[in-house]
Swiss-Prot record:
<dbReference type="GO" id="GO:0005524">
    <property type="term" value="F:ATP binding"/>
</dbReference>
<keyword id="KW-0436">Ligase</keyword>
<feature type="binding site">
    <location>
        <position position="209"/>
    </location>
    <ligand>
        <name>Zn(2+)</name>
    </ligand>
</feature>
<feature type="short sequence motif" description="'HIGH' region">
    <location>
        <begin position="30"/>
        <end position="40"/>
    </location>
</feature>
<dbReference type="InterPro" id="IPR024909">
    <property type="entry name" value="Cys-tRNA/MSH_ligase"/>
</dbReference>
<feature type="binding site">
    <location>
        <position position="269"/>
    </location>
    <ligand>
        <name>ATP</name>
    </ligand>
</feature>
<dbReference type="InterPro" id="IPR015803">
    <property type="entry name" value="Cys-tRNA-ligase"/>
</dbReference>
<keyword id="KW-0963">Cytoplasm</keyword>
<feature type="binding site">
    <location>
        <position position="238"/>
    </location>
    <ligand>
        <name>Zn(2+)</name>
    </ligand>
</feature>
<keyword id="KW-0648">Protein biosynthesis</keyword>
<keyword id="KW-0547">Nucleotide-binding</keyword>
<keyword id="KW-0479">Metal-binding</keyword>
<dbReference type="GO" id="GO:0004817">
    <property type="term" value="F:cysteine-tRNA ligase activity"/>
</dbReference>
<dbReference type="Pfam" id="PF09190">
    <property type="entry name" value="DALR_2"/>
</dbReference>
<feature type="short sequence motif" description="'KMSKS' region">
    <location>
        <begin position="266"/>
        <end position="270"/>
    </location>
</feature>
<comment type="similarity">
    <text>Belongs to the class-I aminoacyl-tRNA synthetase family.</text>
</comment>
<dbReference type="Pfam" id="PF01406">
    <property type="entry name" value="tRNA-synt_1e"/>
</dbReference>
Amino acid sequence: MLSIYNTLTKSKEVFKPLDGNKVRMYVCGMTVYDYCHLGHGRSMVAFDLVTRWLRFSGYELTYVRNITDIDDKIINRARDNGESFDALTARMIDAMHEDEARLNILKPDMEPRATDHIAGMHAMIQTLIDKGYAYAPGNGDVYYRVGKFQGYGKLSRKKIEDLRIGARIEVDESKEDPLDFVLWKGVKPGEPSWESPWGAGRPGWHIECSVMSTCCLGDTFDIHGGGSDLEFPHHENEIAQSEAATGKTYANAWLHCGMIRINGEKMSKSLNNFFTIRDVLEKYHPEVVRYLLVSSHYRSAINYSEDSLRESKAALERFYHALKGLPVAEPAGGEAFVERFSTAMNDDFGTPEACAVLFEMVREINRLRESDVTAAAGLAARLKQLASVLGVLQLEADDFLRAGAEGRVDAAQVEALIQARLAARAAKDWAESDRIRDQITAMGVLLEDGKGGTTWRLAD
């Protein structure tokens, strides 16, 4: 039975879908003004993991992840680039999809874009005005009346009184309360805009997600997810808008993933301490990056370093060495491993414990391959089956272990030298055999002699 940590209740609770075996999940996606950094990759992989485990467990999941394609940052970047905002977002959306494909991230079932839901935003804003939760001061803006919503702060545990005392908010005479947030922004010169009942303008960030999520999944759905940095104010404001508009619970459970940190600080573009996914993939195999992101618990912060990536690479090499050379088989055996893996994953998607189970399977595969290759092959297939939940170990072992060889060594030359060494060994010319091995080693290649013959991989 799956238990999840619900940020709304600040407790771990048994997951009970609203509608039998069907699960509806919405996750806040990217604001597409630049290439995705590794922090975005963290969120992508975290909710890809949730998606994979829910489906592996037999749930019928509808996964929606939005794209924010109109925003101050987008407008400013497009202006700096001398291009239209939609040309910029089209390029960045394509780049995001390329990054996701390389990290083996499954596509969401729906990927709504904010600019396709302007009419829905108008409708929700008008409902909020009609119910007294929003007001239009006459300058083209529309604001949400925070003080009217009795449940404000229930997600973040922040109190309105404390926010007013602690906030440094610029005076805006058009607001009734400094904490009120914008639902609709009146048009400014040179900015994209849409007509509305309150004049030309564009939506605020928070209303975008309220409308896209409820449009795709209904007024109430099972899971809302995102990075922990979105808990306040974004997700708090989503709840305030949505529940005031519909009179219903917005999302039953809230999942928040941890941040990537560099020297203890959150990785972000605003702090200029970020690495794009593309930067990292220039140096490391995509599966190494994915394993780094998925092997830590999704709610934990990950401290990014070259050492952590090297550790991820070494872990995957252990897995692939165990798989290497075994015949293709159907998953067989390992029922106790499956049970323990499932127990770990059902405990709030506990990937550290799940990975520990996979390493125990590696030890058993290595033990079996010396005495029972058939059993070893069946257990290896089981290992790959479970690892598919993490989105790893789906490559051919040699392909991963030789990754990066292009441009570094001549594979044909290595293969020719291996054949020459085998001939020398067959002729019992041990000196020549050793000389060839030394030559291959000097090329940065490691040889491994086994029952199935000699294989090779790049040295670290």
